[in-house]
Amino acid sequence: MVHGEAFSRPLSRNEVVGLIFRLTIFGAVTYFTIKWMVDAIDPTRKQKVEAQKQAEKLMRQIGVKNVKLTEYEMSIAAHLVDPLSMLVTWSDIAGLDDVITDLKDTVILPIRKRYLFENSRLLQPPKGVLLYGPPGCGKTMIAKATAKEAGCRFINLQPSTLTDKWYGESQKLAAAVFSLAVKLQPSIIFIDEIDSFLRSRSSSDHEATAMMKAQFMSLWDGLDTDFNCQVIVMGATNRPQDLDTAIMRRMPTRFHINQPSLKQREAILDLILRNESVDSHVDLMEIARGSDGFSGSDLKEMCRDAALLCVRDSVNNSSEESPCEEIRPIHQQDLLRAIDKMKRSKSATNQNVLMHVSLD
């Protein structure tokens, strides 16, 4: 009877406050416990939250409004590149005039002048473009300049973005790549070193990897069935022979970005040294002849070494009484010394590669 009366009597004010306090403590402990367990189960949760914030920031920068994105699309959107923030233009690329002209005709013109081509299926921009050739010859620069010139949203897709330890998540991320690109079209999905991601399939491939590749190619095929879709998959590789034949079929437009010829090297050197302090007696044609086999990246590094020689000489010839006030111009001899250094470096690298090959 006493117990019944205790339950039936109203709670005092202190008891109510105490009960609310205990419930609050219990709720807070439960919340943080669950949050800790979720974070422990998914260690990438923090990175996903940061990626979402980055994606929202990029979406605002490129002027995309009122577009709802899924969680997976947000993860991909973190790799968006604002075309206005790209500093690469056609004027930054020398010696590839033929490639640039073909790209303008086959890719850029159908996007920028869409109204001229909308009634023809043959004149639509290709759904796959492959840039292949030796390293350091400007493939990535060409892709960025193409996106900027065409006014496309640029998704710089990293293969690691599509890998997830949870079963089925990689396929969802692959689907998000294309659904996001369609929402933001015109857009370019750029995959650098595409051979590392979509290499020839074999029976030794992991099941999840094989399923993700199949999903990616299936969604890629979907672009061809949509007549008005303006999404282009652009890949760059220096090992086209490693690409899956099914991928090659989906990239019918191909551009070979080869090692620069003599005239191309001269044009590249002129571009690199255009805004630098260079002696008027420098003969770029002679430098171009001496740099046979150099890529565009090699030529830039060679010119940097020549400029550093000028800095070193200016600093060494200065003293406390007469400090260095300006750096002397780049001379012909500086460039020739830089060529010798680059050749020794390339020769040593090739020897190391051969040693590793022979050991294997």
UniProtKB/Swiss-Prot annotation:
The chain crosses the membrane at residues 16-34. Keywords: ATP-binding, Cell membrane, Membrane, Mitochondrion, Mitochondrion outer membrane, Nucleotide-binding, Peroxisome, Postsynaptic cell membrane, Synapse, Translocase, Transmembrane, Transmembrane helix. The keyword Transcription does not apply. Residues 1-15 are mitochondrial intermembrane. ATP binds at residues 133-140. It comes from the Eukaryota. It is a single-pass membrane protein. Its EC number is 7.4.2.-. InterPro entries: AAA+_ATPase, AAA_lid_3, ATPase_AAA_core, ATPase_AAA_CS, Mito_OM_Translocase_MSP1, P-loop_NTPase. Its main location: mitochondrion. It catalyses: [protein]-with a C-terminal TM segment(out) + ATP + H2O = [protein]-with a C-terminal TM segment(in) + ADP + phosphate + H(+). It is an enzyme of class 7 (translocase). Residues 35-360 are cytoplasmic. GO terms for cellular component: mitochondrial outer membrane; peroxisomal membrane; postsynaptic membrane. Pfam families: AAA, AAA_lid_3. GO terms for molecular function: ATP binding; ATP hydrolysis activity; membrane protein dislocase activity. GO terms for biological process: extraction of mislocalized protein from mitochondrial outer membrane. SUPFAM superfamilies: P-loop containing nucleoside triphosphate hydrolases. It is found in: Mitochondrion outer membrane; Peroxisome membrane; Postsynaptic cell membrane. Outer mitochondrial translocase required to remove mislocalized tail-anchored transmembrane proteins on mitochondria. Specifically recognizes and binds tail-anchored transmembrane proteins: acts as a dislocase that mediates the ATP-dependent extraction of mistargeted tail-anchored transmembrane proteins from the mitochondrion outer membrane. Also plays a critical role in regulating the surface expression of AMPA receptors (AMPAR), thereby regulating synaptic plasticity and learning and memory. Belongs to the AAA ATPase family. MSP1 subfamily. This is Outer mitochondrial transmembrane helix translocase. It comes from Xenopus tropicalis (Western clawed frog).
